[in-house]
């Protein structure tokens, strides 16, 4: 299953000038919602991701995703493994666990996103789980944007990755796009204005 082809076929591999949730800019953006709007395809991707985690010997009880982008991917991963699913969400810009969700002491979690860039939102979710007595055994995503090392791939992680080095990240694909600070962005220097398509913008 070629993830890049899947994103292109779904119209989810976007080219333009994008403002990322990290406040950095990129010429490319992966709009996973366009892939996950197809329940059959979403299920197939989640089944494959679950098999990757299972084959690595990582056992978990539940899946937690940061809202909004990670919810569909995380729910489908939980379905694939017949696990419980919960999600965290931002309340006044602070990641929180609400809606009656609870975490049992020692409960093992995979934190699942649709896309991992630097892993900031996933790390925020992981900290909440651990503060409540849960155990984060790994991270998962449909796609990695090239900053974090993926356990089931041969890419090298970068210093900007925020995920802990002692916990594995599993993904179905690795996309390496150039990302720029607003001050260094060559697209801005041509007069182009970045648009914000991501989860924190709309």
From Swiss-Prot:
Q: Which residues bind 5-phospho-alpha-D-ribose 1-diphosphate?
A: 93, 113-121
**Listed cofactors:** Mg(2+)
Q: What is its EC number?
A: 2.4.2.10
Give the pathway annotation: Pyrimidine metabolism; UMP biosynthesis via de novo pathway; UMP from orotate: step 1/2
Any one GO BP annotation for this protein: pyrimidine nucleobase biosynthetic process
Q: Which reaction does it catalyse?
A: orotidine 5'-phosphate + diphosphate = orotate + 5-phospho-alpha-D-ribose 1-diphosphate
* Residues at which orotate binds: 117, 145
Spell out the molecular function terms from Gene Ontology: magnesium ion binding; orotate phosphoribosyltransferase activity
Keywords (alphabetical) are:
Glycosyltransferase, Magnesium, Pyrimidine biosynthesis, Transferase
**HAMAP family attached to this UniProt entry:** PyrE (MF_01208)
| Functional summary from the UniProt entry | Catalyzes the transfer of a ribosyl phosphate group from 5-phosphoribose 1-diphosphate to orotate, leading to the formation of orotidine monophosphate (OMP).
| Family stated for the protein in its record | Belongs to the purine/pyrimidine phosphoribosyltransferase family. PyrE subfamily.
Q: How does it assemble?
A: Homodimer.
- Protein name as it appears in the record: Orotate phosphoribosyltransferase
Source organism of the structure: Campylobacter fetus subsp. fetus (strain 82-40)
- The primary gene name is pyrE
């Amino acid at each position: 299953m070629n993830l890049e082809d899947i994103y292109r076929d779904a119209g989810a591999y976007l080219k333009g000038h994008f403002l990322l949730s990290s406040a950095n800019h990129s010429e490319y953006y992966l709009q996973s919602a366009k892939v996950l709007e197809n329940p059959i395809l979403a299920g197939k991707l989640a089944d494959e991701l679950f098999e990757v985690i299972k084959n690595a010997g990582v056992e978990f009880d539940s899946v937690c995703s940061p809202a909004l982008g990670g919810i569909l991917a995380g729910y489908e991963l939980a379905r694939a493994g017949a696990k419980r699913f919960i999600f965290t969400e931002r309340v006044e810009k602070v990641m929180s666990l609400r809606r009656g969700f609870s975490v049992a002491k020692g409960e093992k979690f995979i934190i699942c996103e649709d896309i991992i860039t630097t892993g900031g939102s996933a790390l925020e979710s992981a900290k909440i789980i651990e503060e409540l007595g849960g155990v984060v055994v790994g991270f998962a995503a449909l796609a990695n944007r090239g900053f974090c090392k993926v356990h089931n791939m041969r890419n090298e992680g970068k210093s900007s990755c925020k995920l802990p080095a002692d916990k594995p990240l599993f993904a179905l694909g690795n996309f390496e796009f150039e990302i720029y600070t607003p001050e260094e962005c060559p697209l801005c220097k041509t007069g182009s204005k970045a648009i914000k398509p991501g989860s924190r913008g709309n």
